[in-house]
Each structure stands twice: as structure tokens, then as C-alpha cells.
Amino acid sequence: MSKTTKYTGTQTEKNLMAAFAGESQARNKYTYFASVAKKQGFEQIAALFLKTADNEKEHAKLWFKELEGIGDTAENLLSAAEGENYEWTDMYDGFAKTAEEEGFKELAARFRLVAAVEKHHEERYRALLHNVEMAEVFAKSEVKVWECRNCGHIVVGEKAPEICPTCNHPQSYFEIHAENY
């Protein structure tokens, strides 16, 4: 995190970052544990893992907000792109080299495969940031097929409607329709 806050350079900043990381990791672990419990027929235990995961998510959000890690959408997209860039250019590259040096060639290959996905994530976030900055999220220079994410209403045009004529949801529910089947 590169933003300067009242905690910058303090042990409290380190503690907040550790609390955020710990709560975030716990949330993920509990969702994985819930999947196992569900597969083994323990619905209540799965539900309790998920409930606790939701609690951990909120705890993490408290600490992340305290660190001023949440901005507006453009700031968040830039932050996400920068994070993904670090992951594919530095983190996973270093992990792969170390794994290879230590004889874990299959793991090194997997680190490199994930790095390629992280590169795609960066590109996607940067494209979305461009759309936000250029006011091109809900308006394009050519005709597109727009779909309401709430009710499925289809509109053909250069711009998504302000309000869905079918379900009255706002423009924010529209996306460019894509069929990938």
C-alpha cells in the first residue's frame, strides 16, 4: 500500500496490515472448509464456516478501511491493476525461480501459469479503468447489445438505457451482452 496515512511508518500500521492479512486468510480458509463440510454432508457445519467467513470479511474490511485502502472505483481499479502487476512481474516470478532452484519444477511451472492469469487480471483492470475515465462504461462509439443483469432485458444501441424498461433497475445494471457458449 503506497498511500500515506496517519499510521504510515508506525508499528500500528504494521499491526493493521497483519490484521487485514490474517482476517482475509481466515475468510478464505473458512470458505474452503465449508466446501469440504458440505461435500461430506455436514450442512450446519458448512453454514457456520460460511457465517464465520462473512464475519472475518467484515473484520478485514474494518482494518483495510482504517488503512485508507478503499477509494472510488477509478482508484480501486488502479490499485487492483498495480497489485496484479506486482504479482505477475515480481512475486510469482520470484516464487517460480526459488521453487525451481529448490527442485520443485512442477510448482515453479504452476507459479508461472498463475502469473499469466494475473497479467490478464491487470490488463482487464486497466481496460475497465480506461472505460471509467473516458465515461465509456455505459456508452460506446458503436452499436452494442446491452443486457440488464437483473431481468435479462436486451437493448441494442450505442448506450445502455438510464432505466431498464422491464424491471426499472438503473443503468448500472446493464452490461454488454456476451454469449460464450
What does each model-identified segment do?
Residues 1-181:
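Non-heme di-metal
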